[in-house]
């Protein structure tokens, strides 16, 4: 019995190629590069190589072990070379992309010919590989749904995947003294650079209807630190990220636990030439300047309050 795919003409595969190929040459704006969208982007490697090999299989019926080996070797060489070139030109090289390429090749080879007894395990293994590579996407999709369901909580760090939405030297860890409390926080390593901190993006952007931004901070050190909170909306890029076009405020991180509240009216009125668009908040950042030595801080319970 032929598979569902084999009952479809090869133009389905070619049509998918036409739809997928342009995306390899599109430069996404930074504001669009959410972890979830990048995970979808990664899966396009599987779809692309599957479509190419499936179309070749439909036309030439590659069934010998030698032909399969040659196709796989060629795909590995091409994909690996592209990743090496990207690494040498300052772009991110990813062997995960090579694994996705090879999974697409394997799927195309195994499903592009008529059913045969010897193909059964190839198809099972290729399907398992596909499922494994879908796990990060599924985790991010589930986390995204949970983040919207938990809003106005922006982040509480009880889900490991949540760290994907933060930029900086950060990790999710237990706070010293609370290791047995089943509570986690964002561990931030600050260095001695002129500006050292972190940024939070791709959270629910509509902050209208709330009055305060709240978060907690634990400073395990013995000295107070001067920190800066900055918030901007999606239109901030149009100003060239001018200082006067965003919200900036200093606050003190005293030793031990600290709780902070910042009025959203102040964020609304912060830009000098316009109002902040509270329906399109894009980035929240916290940083310090010119530390004499590295410092570790813990942040928790980012949320909006009525």
Tell me the role of every PLM-derived stretch:
Residues 305-306:
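Short, solvent-exposed mixed-charge patches
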Residues 1-96, 102, 107-195, 201-205, ...:
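Bulky hydrophobic segments
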Residues 194, 223, 237, 270, ...:
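Residue-level signal for secondary-structure boundary sites
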Residues 217-221:
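Asparagine-centered strand-capping/turn motif at beta-strand->loop junctions
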Residues 215, 259-302:
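Extracellular beta-strand ligand-recognition surfaces/modules
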């Amino acid at each position: 019995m032929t598979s569902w795919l084999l009952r479809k003409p090869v133009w389905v595969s070619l049509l998918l190629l036409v739809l997928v190929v342009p995306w390899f040459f599109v430069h996404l704006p930074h504001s669009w590069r959410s972890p979830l969208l990048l995970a979808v982007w990664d899966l396009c490697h599987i779809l692309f190589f599957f479509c190419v090999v499936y179309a070749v299989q439909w036309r030439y019926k590659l069934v010998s072990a030698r032909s399969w080996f040659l196709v796989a070797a060629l795909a590995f060489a091409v994909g690996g070379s592209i990743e090496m070139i990207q690494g040498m030109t300052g772009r991110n090289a990813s062997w995960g992309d090579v694994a996705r390429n090879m999974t697409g090749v394997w799927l195309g080879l195994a499903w592009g010919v008529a059913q045969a007894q010897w193909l059964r395990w190839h198809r099972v293994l290729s399907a398992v590989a596909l499922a494994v590579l879908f796990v990060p996407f599924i985790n991010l999709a589930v986390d995204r749904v949970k983040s919207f369901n938990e809003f106005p909580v922006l982040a509480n760090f009880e889900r490991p995947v949540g760290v994907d939405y933060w930029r900086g030297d950060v990790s999710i860890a237990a706070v010293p003294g609370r290791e047995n409390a089943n509570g986690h926080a964002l561990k931030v390593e600050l260095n001695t650079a002129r500006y050292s901190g972190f940024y939070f993006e791709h959270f629910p952007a509509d902050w209208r209807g709330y009055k305060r931004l709240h978060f907690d901070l634990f400073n395990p050190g013995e000295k107070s630190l001067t920190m800066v909170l900055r918030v901007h909306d999606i239109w901030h890029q149009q100003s060239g990220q001018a200082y006067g076009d965003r919200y900036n405020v200093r606050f003190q991180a005293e030793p031990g636990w600290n709780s902070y509240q910042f009025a959203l009216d102040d964020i609304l009125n912060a830009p000098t030439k316009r109002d902040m668009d509270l329906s399109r908040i894009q980035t929240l950042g916290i940083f310090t300047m010119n530390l004499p030595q590295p410092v570790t801080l813990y942040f928790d319970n980012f949320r909006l309050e009525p």
